[in-house]
Amino acid sequence: MIKRRYLILLLLPLAMISLFVGVGEMSLAGLWAGNPQDWQLFWTSRLPRLMAIVVAGAGLSVCGLIMQSLSRNRFVSPTTAGLYDCARLGVLVSIILLPSASIFVKTGFAIAVTLMGAMAFMSILATLKHRDTVFVPLVGMIFGSIISAFTTFIALQMDLLQNLAGWLQGDFSTILNGQYELIYLSVPVLILIYIFANRFVLAGLGQDFATNLGLNYKQTLFLGLLLVSVITGVVIVTVGAIPFLGLIVPNLVSLYLGDNIRRTLSHTALLGALLVLFCDVFGRVVIYPYEVSVSLIMGVVGSVIFLWLLLRRYRYAS
């Protein structure tokens, strides 16, 4: 596996490229000369977009890592556990109950409904006698489809479907200074995940084993789901859904570094940020001057890698 410093060395030049790629003209020479238009574009759009990409990519990748540990299944993530759909339902509820609600209130509703959905998903898993590698995420995707269908039905009845369009896919083109800072809430949550990483490792061993080791399993499970829900809710409200990210990145890292969360956490965050940044830059240049959303590119890349992971697991299992 690529060492941490190599991931950073890949991330830095790609971040520099990201700052200077886009429809608006901005150059290093212009910044050096103090061109006010270049600096305005830098502070208003390019830097906020870069920061949002890095934080969202790192956050969602780590969410997948925690979900996989708590569910004891390699293919569980916010995408395959229906958490994105729950977050969108939370946003819809906030729009219905409080039409003039601020983004902070919408985020609060998104986090609350995501947490309830995550707890419901884990409760469903607890009733399953056979936790097959593929069957568990299939259950999660069915659960998410039910939530999504319910959300769409309510939105249609309330004539609010158009209001939800912005949260259906991840898109960083609308990120501007003063409209994205809420995503920074993910940073202290990531720090908390690192602090409690060992507890999540023990929880991933199963309730009986973890309890015998002195761990309060239910408390740790709730804490993990809460932290995942906060990041998921914040990212959904700020930039929208980015499919498969939390599924493929932890799997790619664990192939080489194992399942110790504390050991793989930084690699997972860096690789997630790097992958989203690459997809964003590619989306900006592939049909320039138009843009392809990150969620579309990530959906294609993620589905291919997901299929490869499935085939690889079955090949080695046989």
Language model segments and positions:
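Alpha-helical transmembrane segments in inner-membrane proteins
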Residues: 1-318
